[in-house]
Amino acid sequence: INGFGRIGRIVFRAAQKRSDIEIVAINDLLDAEYMAYMLKYDSTHGRFDGTVEVKDGHLVVNGKKIRVTAERDPANLKWDEVGVDVVAEATGIFLTDETARKHITAGAKKVVLTGPSKDNTPMFVRGANFDAYAGQDIVSNASCTTNCLAPLAKVINDNFGIVEGLMTTVHATTATQKTVDGPSHKDWRGGRGAAQNIIPSSTGAAKAVGKVLPELNGKLTGMAFRVPTPNVSVVDLTVRLEKAASYEEIKKAIKAASEGAMKGVLGYTEDDVVSTDFNGEVCTSVFDAKAGIALNDNFVKLV
């Protein structure tokens, strides 16, 4: 793992629940003792379920020794010394093929970017275009919003056809925001206090769906509202359909996908849920059947 921030630590926690992933090395400019502390305690996801300690400069988790380094340049990471197959590039800095390729130079076989690429590095989203993966050594897993939107958009487009659509994401606070008003030169609104405001913001998530689902290219765009919640975001997708369908028919199509081809990726619920009910959710997208609404058989809002 390169970058042990919010995403890096959540990747680590998720990997601990799987038998087919072994974390062998972490690179971050933090010292090992502080990394152990940040892994152990998490305000959003609670205490780490297991043992965490530091021995001889290594992180030891559940008795397993993990190499810790503090290199600024990924080219110096010597991943081959610890047998790294895949690097989770979670710094948010190295989001191009040219910069991420330094991990390959350092001995890694593959790199997964944990955010949208800044160049033409291919993006892959579960439930959308995983079948298009052709062995590329550097890929992007896009953004959290794209992972929520793409599976839903695919089901709707495959079953009813999307003429055009607008997306709004009601988005939890992220690390780039300010606790109180502060300078944010590129995005003035983004510098306003995160806990006090609903902040309109831009998002490339809807356009990114056009990259992972080319048939929707140019048909979707969207914006975001940053809201004062610590985790879990909502996608509100409003679309015009080619093929007329009642809201009940749309629900049926999504439910069928959630139990079939998209099981484990796209969830479906008819419960009276709220955002905190999805803290730690394993599906990347969960359709809230009760929250959506149709104006008519060709115009519908999905949540």
From Swiss-Prot:
Assigned EC number: 1.2.1.12
Give residues annotated as binding NAD(+): R6, I7, D28, R72, T114
Residues of the active site are C144 (nucleophile)
Provide an example Pfam family for this protein. Answer: Gp_dh_C
The Gene Ontology biological process terms listed for this entry are:
glucose metabolic process; glycolytic process
Q: Which domain of life is it from?
A: Bacteria
Name of the top EC class for this enzyme: oxidoreductase
Signal peptide segment: none
**Record keyword Ion transport present:** no
Q: Might you report a single GO cellular component term?
A: cytoplasm
Query: Is Transport one of the keywords UniProt gives this record?
Result: no
Question: What family does the entry list?
Answer: Belongs to the glyceraldehyde-3-phosphate dehydrogenase family.
Name of the protein described by the UniProt record: Glyceraldehyde-3-phosphate dehydrogenase
Species for this entry:
Klebsiella pneumoniae
